[in-house]
Amino acid sequence: MLASAFGCAVSQKTVVKPSQAPAPLQTATKEQLLDAYNRQARAIQSLNAGVTLKLTAGSAYSGVIEQYHEVNGFILAARPASIRVIGQAPVVSKNVFDMVSNGSTFSIYIPSKNKFIVGPANLERRAEKPIENLRPQHLVDAVFWPVITEATPVLLEEGSEGASRFYILTVVRSEVPQPTTGSSDAASTTADQQRSSQHSTPKWEIARKIWFDRADLRVSRIENFASGGKVASDVAYSNWQTTAATSYPWQINITRPSDDYQLQIAVKKLTVNEPIAPDRFSLPQPAGTDLVNLGENIGDSGHKDSGPNNKEQHP
């Protein structure tokens, strides 16, 4: 009966207008895609951008989705890992946050909370509120791409999402040995690693997946993976525009599943590859603010500290 029901259905044909027809698919080899990616990665050494920032904290998995207001802001970044991000309230242009990272440590100043937060850049302590998981170095991974060396294993596949077609480069790396649980000293851990290294077949894991839209062969998405196959970040790139003899995406959407937030960055003004003074990445603790050191034990994480006077700096 089900077959007859489908057989009795009226067949309809939809004529696609020329303007709605999908763009012809472009073709490329793995070597050509790697070359295009590396040229783009090397092309951007610094950037100074006026942006709008829109943060969504929470996900369907957490059960709570909280949409934050869109704020204006600035992003300063310089290789290898220096970044400063300032968010400002609309109309009054008053800072709502100011954060910096040099790749080793980060600092965040939140005027409304009178808090100055510091910690190591590789901190993986998840906060109860997703918005507190936002770190300046998360943006470094999105705005600066690491170059893929010739010795790095890379796989190529084709993929699709809806009507879009993609080339996907999968970058793999040797699995990072983890210390043996319960090892009481460094000697036992070292011995375990030595025994593991004696295996003739290396253990591999995915480092990144780079998506190229076959409509124009531009990078449209980069997935970065942590150990164990967990997605650390999923970054979408669109609205590519020519800037100073190179091109750059003016829309960057960052999703970090483990940190439970999404950040949409819309570029309004952009300058690339111009020198940025080192003091632009300096953020001293304002006087009278509460210092929260996330690198310390929770019991010692907050205390009153009167830092030197510091006027807010704007890029």
Model-derived features: where do they sit?
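C-terminal motif of bacterial Sec signal peptides marking the signal peptidase cleavage site
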Residues: 3-7
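N-terminal leader/targeting segments and the immediate start of mature chains
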Residues: 8-70, 298-315
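Gly/Pro-enriched, hydrophobic low-complexity segments
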Residues: 9, 156-288
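Extended lipid/amphipathic-ligand handling interfaces
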Residues: 34-36, 72-77, 99-101, 235-242
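Post-signal peptide N-terminal segment of secreted/secretory-pathway proteins
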Residues: 53-97
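Amphipathic hydrophobic-ligand
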Residues: 64-71, 95-101, 202-204, 229-234
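An acidic-aromatic
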Residues: 80-138
